[in-house]
């Protein structure tokens, strides 16, 4: 409610909204709910899409409201207190680095964020002449950083084995497990293992659902559900032997797309507490709440500065949409860690939108020799694992066409001679060359370089006078800003292409168990039919043309995922079959003849005899079995 905010904010955060009401999609976790702000996202133009997604991102900084039930938020006293406690535990490792380690771990987007942050904080420590103490784990290994391999996060044992390898011989290990929806088995196994070995390990769980909404279906290779693991951690938190950091940040602008707000909030929360730990460790004091609030406000400022460029972001979105509509390709060429953000955005479009890996791709310009755990995993693995400057020059530049779009992403502190030389080579092949440029007050883009870009988004940051660790605030701001711009552009471009129904992505690839349950929830939502009927239709679409046997029906979810993640249009096929009461083959034929997946589904939804609520879900599709 107005006037209830405890802290002074840089941006105008939304008041608590409809999604907080106890009856709103009650069967669905917050991270999987549909956001009321974007209910009509599919009807919005580019400018409106930017505005709506910007409002969703602002919800990260929203304080607790007066509506019951009240979820704890990023600025809640309980969350800030836990952040300080975790920062103190990290400081213990920093003060006695011999035998110490900080592990950041996750699957998919969360694992890529773990990679990015471990790179950043190791760079920070090297700059101080200190031995780097951070490492990362990502489900599926280093190949999952640069390619879509979301199915690898479904094994708890895989997570434990990877943790044992990096922690071998260490005396004190802080393990920060990131799972936006509190659902990834890869992380659950690690947290359980840490709680069984507290003499060495301190587990910290980061996610954005209440523990009561953590996934509660059985993990195929583990003894506990994710919810049981999280509940155990809550009990151990009383003795500070484990911690759970799980503020609510509201539903995603595109339902369930945790690469967006979930990824951004992960970055904000962890960089705030880790930077606070580093800033105060030499002063011999534990980080203060004031220190946390100062850093959080700089991230709020990043939101303000980024979305002040909304009209230019919309222009870039439209250009990217045009390229994709014409079957062209979009190349995001980023310098240093901005290149990592670019790679992440491209990779995540594959399972989110059912995109081809070549549709939107990121490339990293700069030295990455000491970033990866196992760089050999990325050598000679095929075109979908290419991401370097050499890869761009040899495999992309020669084949650029006029339907492609190339976006340069850099700061004015980067090597501008190098930027200009590459931009000139690209301009010889392709006129659709854009730029996202970060500068500090007083810096200006050289005229010869500026002329190369017909359109550019120029984001100017205020001067910050911080100590050495504090200079990383601006680096983190620029990364977050770049993430917001690219996520908004790639999401919006797919909205403009007609890929979205309301604020749901129907044509996502079912790449892991989380996406299997999301697919089932969408079928229930839009068909209004029973859970059993929706399961039957989903399995028929997955295994087509093979008929469903009782053995197939009884198979573990991992077996269905293994088949589904190689197939396209599984969910639309199943939904059409339900809506039209037709066979899978007839549904596939209708989709093949249609210009847009969502248009043919809309037509079926508005057909005679279709009586259903698109808001109502029957039972939570997280029961653990398909019976």
Swiss-Prot record:
Tell me a Gene Ontology molecular-function term this record carries: fructose-6-phosphate binding
Q: Which InterPro entries match?
A: GKRP_SIS_2, Glucokinase_regulatory_CS, MURQ/GCKR, SIS_dom, SIS_dom_sf
Annotated segments matching region Essential for interaction with GCK: 463-465
Any idea which positions bind beta-D-fructose 1-phosphate? 109-110, 153, 179-181, 348, 514
Q: Which biological process terms from the Gene Ontology are attached to this UniProt entry? A: carbohydrate derivative metabolic process; glucose metabolic process; intracellular glucose homeostasis; protein import into nucleus; protein localization to nucleus; response to fructose; response to glucose; triglyceride homeostasis
Q: How would you summarize where this protein is expressed among tissues? A: Detected in liver (at protein level). Not detected in muscle, brain, heart, testis, intestine or spleen.
Please provide the record's keywords in A-Z order.
Carbohydrate metabolism, Cytoplasm, Mitochondrion, Nucleus, Repeat
Answer yes or no on keyword Membrane. Answer: no
Binding positions for beta-D-fructose 6-phosphate per the UniProt entry = 109-110, 179-181, 514
Name all SIS domain ranges: 90-286, 320-499
Its localization reads: Cytoplasm; Nucleus; Mitochondrion
Does this UniProt record's set of keywords contain Transferase? no
Region: Important for interaction with GCK, residue numbers: 199-200
The GO cellular component terms are: cytoplasm; cytosol; mitochondrion; nucleoplasm; nucleus
Known partners and oligomeric status: Interacts (fructose 6-phosphate bound form) with GCK.
Q: What does this protein do?
A: Regulates glucokinase (GCK) by forming an inactive complex with this enzyme. Acts by promoting GCK recruitment to the nucleus, possibly to provide a reserve of GCK that can be quickly released in the cytoplasm after a meal. The affinity of GCKR for GCK is modulated by fructose metabolites: GCKR with bound fructose 6-phosphate has increased affinity for GCK, while GCKR with bound fructose 1-phosphate has strongly decreased affinity for GCK and does not inhibit GCK activity.
What's in the domain note?
Fructose 1-phosphate and fructose 6-phosphate compete for the same binding site.
Q: Which family does it belong to?
A: Belongs to the GCKR family.
- Recorded protein name is Glucokinase regulatory protein
Q: Which organism is it from?
A: Rattus norvegicus
